[in-house]
Amino acid sequence: MTIKYHVNGLYVKKDGDLYQIGLSGKGQDDVGDVMFCDLVKQEGYLSKGDTIMGVEGAKAVTDFTAPFDGQIVAANQAIEDQPDLLNSSSQEENWILKLQEVKEEDFNRLSDQVWPEEDD
């Protein structure tokens, strides 16, 4: 299992051929306490830059975008009914989507730094 980070505030956890995307500590800090969440993309094929989720937090209203292409295999629909799950530090609770068919080189371009400063 490997975890990498995207500059827009997402983490990506790779476990075999499954890639779990969730809200990182940076994303939580940027948005503040999440009060509303809209999962824009819940099925099908995801392209890099597609909006996957819109959130309203104490500090900002933000759209989060996909860091790479992939096939959605699961969406955490619980975060729409309980958006405070995104405030959790637990990756079992704060995940957004799970993908397959991700190119390894796209994943490897993400940062190893928890608080990346710029997009690679």
Language model features: what each stretch is:
Residues 1-48, 88-120:
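Acidic, low-complexity mobile loops and tails
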Residues 9-11, 64, 72:
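Conserved hydrophobic positions within beta-strands
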Residues 12-14, 58, 75:
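Residue-level recognition of beta-strand microenvironments
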Residues 45, 63, 69-71:
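Beta-solenoid/beta-rich acyl/carboxylate-transfer cores
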Residues 46, 52-53, 73:
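Generic structural signal for buried aliphatic residues
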Residues 51-53, 58-60, 78-79, 103:
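Short, charged beta-turn/beta-strand-edge "cap" motif at the junction between a beta-strand
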Residues 56-65, 82-85, 107:
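Short, Lys/Arg- and Gly-enriched loop/turn segments at beta-strand edges
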Residues 69-89, 95-97, 102:
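Short peripheral tails and domain-boundary helices/loops at the edges of structured domains
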